[in-house]
Amino acid sequence: MASLNQEQLKILEQTRQRLLHLTQSLGSLSNSINQSDPLPPWSSLQSQATIISNNLLSISHLLTEHQELLSSIVAYPTPNFPGRTESTILHQLMRTKLEPRVEEWVARGRNVARHNTASSQIRAQQGAAAEGETVRLSVDELLDLWHWAPIAANMEARRRDWGGDYTLEEKEMGVKNVITGLKRQLDEGDEEDEEEEEEEEDMQGEEMEVVVGAHTKAGGGSGVEFDIARGSSHIPSKPVAPGMPLDDIFRFMMTGAPPRPR
């Protein structure tokens, strides 16, 4: 390939600048999340995400517009290139294949784009054929949906913590090292059972009157008198002392003076 002209060099420089802006935006978002405690406000994160989205859109338009030029450019070192001191950059420039992780991302993105393009064409054809009717998924699309949905739902469920006292990260670090876990929701039914048991005990402890005998009234009067005896398990309640006035309580709290006898 012949040497690049000024217009082609300008396109390469624009691509480099926009990739640099994207790298800086991603680094800024990563630092704000990792170093801020507490996390930045939602408006700040949303603003940074919007900037990253605009950078990605700009790079996508630039790569699509100059796809022919960028795909035909070949990098090669000149004799003056410092290959020994800049070997890392040289290997990156001479690399002909993407990294495995990046290659997987590209394949996934192309698959999604291909599927969306095919679905859009099918919907457009169906809309042109029957305008106003509800667009339904095809058999292949339904099969793909039913194959994808349970796997995606299972993966999403595993990434979340469904009702434990501690999060997955806290369990991995060790529960003993956790200062405060998630608050457990107590069952109100336990409190109601305890109140019912206390009421039954109080009823059993209440005094019971028992008729133990009967005799005629003293003095020769007409009628019958009954002898009433209390249950053997009855325990007389202790008299309750009167409550302390609030004035004495506040005076003791402020000055330490003991309450006045009553």
From Swiss-Prot:
Name the cystine pairs: none
Keyword set, alphabetical order: Activator, Coiled coil, Nucleus, Transcription, Transcription regulation
This one is known as Mediator of RNA polymerase II transcription subunit 8
Region annotation (Disordered) ranges: 183-206
Coiled-coil regions in this chain?
A: 168-211
GO molecular function (one): transcription coregulator activity
Ranges annotated as biased composition (Acidic residues): 188-206
Q: Which InterPro entries match?
A: Mediatior_Med8_fun/met
What is the annotated localization of this protein?
Nucleus
Q: Does the keyword section mention Transcription regulation? A: yes
Family, per the entry? Belongs to the Mediator complex subunit 8 family.
The function of this protein is: Component of the Mediator complex, a coactivator involved in the regulated transcription of nearly all RNA polymerase II-dependent genes. Mediator functions as a bridge to convey information from gene-specific regulatory proteins to the basal RNA polymerase II transcription machinery. Mediator is recruited to promoters by direct interactions with regulatory proteins and serves as a scaffold for the assembly of a functional preinitiation complex with RNA polymerase II and the general transcription factors.
Give a GO biological-process term: regulation of transcription by RNA polymerase II
* Subunit field text: Component of the Mediator complex.
Q: Name one GO cellular component term.
A: mediator complex
Q: Is Transcription included in the keywords of this UniProt record?
A: yes
